[in-house]
Each structure stands twice: as structure tokens, then as C-alpha cells.
From Swiss-Prot:
Protein name per its UniProtKB record: ATP synthase subunit 9, mitochondrial
Residues making up the signal peptide according to the UniProt record: none
Function of the molecule: This protein is one of the chains of the nonenzymatic membrane component (F0) of mitochondrial ATPase.
CDD domains xref list: ATP-synt_Fo_c_ATP5G3
Subcellular location: Mitochondrion membrane
Misc note: A stretch of 270 kb of the mitochondrial genome is duplicated within the centromere of chromosome 2 resulting in the duplication of the gene. The expression of this duplicated gene (At2g07671) is not demonstrated. It is also probably not RNA edited and therefore differs in all the positions known to be edited.
Topology in the lipid bilayer: Multi-pass membrane protein
Family named by the database record: Belongs to the ATPase C chain family.
Protein origin, superkingdom: Eukaryota
One example of a Gene Ontology biological process annotation: proton motive force-driven ATP synthesis
Taxonomic source organism: Arabidopsis thaliana (Mouse-ear cress)
GO CC, alphabetical: mitochondrial membrane; proton-transporting ATP synthase complex; proton-transporting two-sector ATPase complex, proton-transporting domain
Taxonomic lineage of the native organism: Eukaryota, Viridiplantae, Streptophyta, Embryophyta, Tracheophyta
Residues the record marks as site: Reversibly protonated during proton transport: E68
Disulfide bonds listed in the record: none
Length: 85
């Protein structure tokens, strides 16, 4: 009887890539929560002091952009893990 040998390394590598990409996309959930917090704070702040709405909106957009940049970096890392490595 011959012993069958299986080369499971490509399948293991593909599985590790999928797990790594999934772990990298966890940051997207954190970014979504962060964006929600930014605009929630904007609404509360404008409700307290409507005269500062214009200035607060600028700060909120800056906070949104920085939070979204983190999400885009996480998405970029997930795509790099999936398609490059």
C-alpha cells in the first residue's frame, strides 16, 4: 500500500491570508463607531451652543477625516494581505 502525501501548505497559506484580512477589517468597525461618536458630539454641542455651529462643524469634519483615514488604512492593509502576499 502506498502512502498518500498531501501538500496542504497552499491551503494553509490561503486560510492564513483570509484570517489576517478579516482581523485587519476589525478596525473598520472601530472607525464606524468613532465616526458616530464625532457626529453625536457635534449634535450635542450645537444643541448646547448654536452660535458655535459653524466652528464646531469644521472640527467635526476634521475629526471625521482623521477617523476615516484610519479606516482606509485598515482596508488597504486587508487588500494588501489578500492580493499581494
Amino acid at each position: 500500500m502506498t502512502k498518500r502525501e498531501y501538500n496542504s501548505q497552499p491551503e494553509m497559506l490561503e486560510g492564513a491570508k483570509l484570517i489576517g484580512a478579516g482581523a485587519a477589517t476589525i478596525a473598520l468597525a472601530g472607525a464606524a463607531i468613532g465616526i458616530g461618536n464625532v457626529f453625536s458630539s457635534l449634535i450635542h454641542s450645537v444643541a448646547r451652543n448654536p452660535s458655535l455651529a459653524k466652528q464646531l462643524f469644521g472640527y467635526a469634519i476634521l475629526g471625521f477625516a482623521l477617523t476615516e483615514a484610519i479606516a482606509l488604512f485598515a482596508l488597504m492593509m486587508a487588500f494588501l494581505i489578500l492580493f499581494v502576499f
